[in-house]
């Protein structure tokens, strides 16, 4: 590669790196995205769920009033430009796992902040195909992303803009100085690491408390139409209906084993979970995928500059909520880099200095 000058090198073209690069390009900054074609990205195996209310306590995502509109604007804008569909809004049928979850739901129904996002079941018939002894509810303003298709389209946009290089990145090949960074003859003012779980091995950011979580999902087809077929079903595991009639089902959660090889053990676990919740339905597996979620111990992203090398930056740690969080944070971080706007203090890595 001949010597060239950019404003930013972005390492990783998962959802975080892609949307940050897009925001910087929109601010007339020259970027070069370096990626190994998703070898380490959890984005291509994620469910791509957009879900404002999560967890056993049915907790509303902090900042949802600005995070969700930012995500919707981002994905609709990409769809309009591409002429393709990436974002599929769908309600979610939430199946309670126990009496405690039912009690949390009843409390949330008394809180006006939850009114736009949760509703009682309009009819018990929605549960006719699901084993649900504790009942359930409807979660609104949910949906999912076709992440693989969206990232492929974005990669093509970076390529035609001379802003993409497919290669394996090695930290030892990066030179950092007071004037910026250099990699393979390419000089830039700054490097931004969007490496997903590999961020935990980054020599500049390995001190940050990542909480990596490995997960596997199944692709497949049920042997009959499940009711409701036009909802995401969250019954401990999520069952996500694809537009072509296929489903995604997942996910497992492991903290000890951190590789991306699929396992027979996970397949058996997921199939047992499927049959427990959908006892009268068969499921033919057509594919299986594994990935590692780059979550954090305090559940906030890692964004900002290295405390000793300000040209070295990170944009990572979005865990399983990347589809909802990344659009707003990408725009904010780009504004911080270009216009010196302040970072969200909860996400700024200076909290660990």
Predicted regions and their residues:
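Short beta-strand to alpha-helix junction loop
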Residues: 58-70, 137-153, 261-266, 324
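Active-site substrate-recognition segment that forms the wall
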Residues: 19-27, 36, 44, 49, ...
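Helical element adjacent to the flavin cofactor pocket in flavoenzyme catalytic cores
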Residues: 137-190, 194, 198
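C-terminal catalytic lobe of FAD-dependent flavoproteins
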Residues: 284-353
